């Protein structure tokens, strides 16, 4: 994962998803952000494509103050169980480092 920038309440970072069975082209997936015991599901319209890269744009105010770290999960279809998804951790974003680096 390669962080791009953090300015104010807008967080944008490149997501490299290599979770087995996960495809950005599939409609059958969800991405979940967890921070400060809060959870937000990311919808397909929150994913911005730039060539072959995919960026995730997030309004971080929904997590409240004092954020330290955000974990990004992908839910991928489980081929062994119908209507079941496997949660796979795909990224950990250190929000303090982003703020320090980009002055948010």
Regions found by a protein language model. Give the residues of each.
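Contiguous segments within soluble domain cores/interaction surfaces
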Residues: 1-104
């Amino acid at each position: 994962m390669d962080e791009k920038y953090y300015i104010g309440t807008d967080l944008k970072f490149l997501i490299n998803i290599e979770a087995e069975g996960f495809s950005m082209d599939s409609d059958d997936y969800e991405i979940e952000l967890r921070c400060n015991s809060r959870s937000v599901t990311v919808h397909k319209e929150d994913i911005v494509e730039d060539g072959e890269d995919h960026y995730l744009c997030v309004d971080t105010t929904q997590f409240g103050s004092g954020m330290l770290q955000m974990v990004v999960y992908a839910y991928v279809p489980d081929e062994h169980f119908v209507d079941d998804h496997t949660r796979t951790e795909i990224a950990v974003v250190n929000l303090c480092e982003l703020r320090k680096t980009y002055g948010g």
